[in-house]
Amino acid sequence: TLIEATGSQTHLEALRRRAAAQGLRIADGRLWSGGDALAVADELQLYAALGCQWVPPELREDGAELEAAAHRRLPTLVEPGDLRGALHNHTTDSDGTASVEAMARAAAELGWKFVGIADHSPAAHYANGLSADRLAAQWRVIDGLNARGGPRLVKGIEADILPDGRLDLPAGCEVGLEYVVASVHSSFRMAAEAQTERILAAVRHPACRVLGHPTGRLLLARPGYELDL
């Protein structure tokens, strides 16, 4: 069932201990009392039967959250309607699937206040990274859309963090550039100390506002690089 496949194993073990303390057990996706399966229709009822507030999957970690749930003290999570914008976005100018214009329309439909446009930098040739000229052309499109009103389009770029910690920024882009998403896209096998210093050097750049995919891990596909977070 979902509850047995979602969240950490530690959380599930803590949930089972809580059930056992009440003479119950969780097995085969059901809540049992002796040999009888209790009438529990969903997760909300399962947690309620154990005297707890429902714990969203995002909070299922080391088991300590169950204590908070028992006292109705879980934090309120951010919901889609709370979002006002996003900054790490690509368009068809690099390797995205929507144009700048389509991104602006989508942001308006979502009720966002802003949307950052941060296509890849030149070093990301595999992702059609933008040269200085192409970035300038994109910014002219952004200026035109911003002049019409609606969610503000923010001028950014996802800059590769080079092995020495420098950011791969198109020449002259500092004038007009509002923010940088700094990301590691190469040299994943550096030693932890060197990788950490590399990333620290990048985030110290005055234009850097976002550290993109900070661990480099691709779930079930690639382990993260070594660094001290």
Regions found by a protein language model. Name each.
Residues 108-109, 169-177, 201-207:
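Acidic (Asp/Glu)-rich catalytic clusters
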Residues 3, 127-129, 165-168:
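Short acidic, glycine/serine/threonine-rich loops at helix termini
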Residues 163-173, 199-200, 222-227:
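Distinct, well-ordered alpha-helical segments
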Residues 65-162, 187-189, 193, 210, ...:
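An N-terminally biased module of ancient metal coordination in phosphate/nucleic-acid-related enzymes
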Residues 31-32, 37-38, 172-176, 188-189, ...:
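Hydrophobic/basic alpha-helical segments enriched in Actinobacteria
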Residues 136-139, 166-181:
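Short, electropositive alpha-helical surface patch
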Residues 1-79:
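Acidic, metal-coordinating catalytic segment for phosphate/diphosphate chemistry
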